[in-house]
């Protein structure tokens, strides 16, 4: 995974459940797939990592790296907070049907994949309004100075009852597509 935080969470969950046969690789799929340093594994997981670039080539490489199964996730519906921010800015937040294109591409490649929808509701914790703002700015398309002021004001109104420098918690909901297949 390109995200050190995601790897940290995976490792923590694996340790909690006594799972010791995971190899953690802190790189992008593009870096991983473009080198010969990764040998085939029983299972390959690609979560939110195939959003751009040559998808067919990346999927082919991932499929070659998997001996038994491949599991990939793609965001479908953004969180309610993201939708609120976009609505407040007067923008349209395009939901992401990329998984449909991936499914069709896999079929063209001769891979009979499965698709499961996963609704996720989790308690998110942020280190104050600045942390939430930084994550929104990272996910949003470019924000003008005016947009940044509007977003900060919105967040302060929404979470203002909490100390701006304290940990802010709220439920984040989203919908994901799990695209997976087993190898013959």
Question: How would you describe each model-predicted region?
Answer:
Residues 30, 41-57:
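A short SAM/SAH-binding and catalytic strip from SAM-dependent methyltransferases
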Residues 95-110, 114-116:
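Short alpha-helix
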């Amino acid at each position: 995974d390109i995200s050190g935080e995601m790897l940290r969470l995976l490792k923590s969950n694996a340790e909690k459940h006594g799972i010791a046969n995971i190899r953690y690789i802190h790189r992008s799929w593009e870096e991983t797939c473009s080198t010969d340093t990764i040998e085939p594994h029983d299972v390959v997981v690609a979560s939110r990592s195939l959003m751009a670039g040559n998808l067919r080539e990346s999927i082919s490489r991932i499929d070659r790296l998997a001996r038994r199964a491949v599991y990939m996730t793609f965001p479908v519906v953004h969180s309610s907070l993201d939708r609120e921010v976009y609505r407040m800015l007067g923008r349209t937040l395009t939901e992401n049907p990329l998984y449909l294109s991936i499914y069709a591409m896999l079929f063209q490649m001769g891979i009979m994949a499965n698709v499961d929808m996963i609704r996720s509701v989790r308690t998110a914790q942020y280190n104050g309004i600045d942390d939430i703002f930084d994550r929104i700015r990272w996910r949003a398309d470019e924000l003008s100075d005016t947009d940044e002021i509007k977003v900060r004001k919105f967040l302060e109104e929404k979470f203002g009852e909490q100390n701006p420098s304290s940990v802010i918690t709220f439920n984040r909901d989203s919908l994901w597509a799990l695209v997976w297949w087993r190898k013959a």
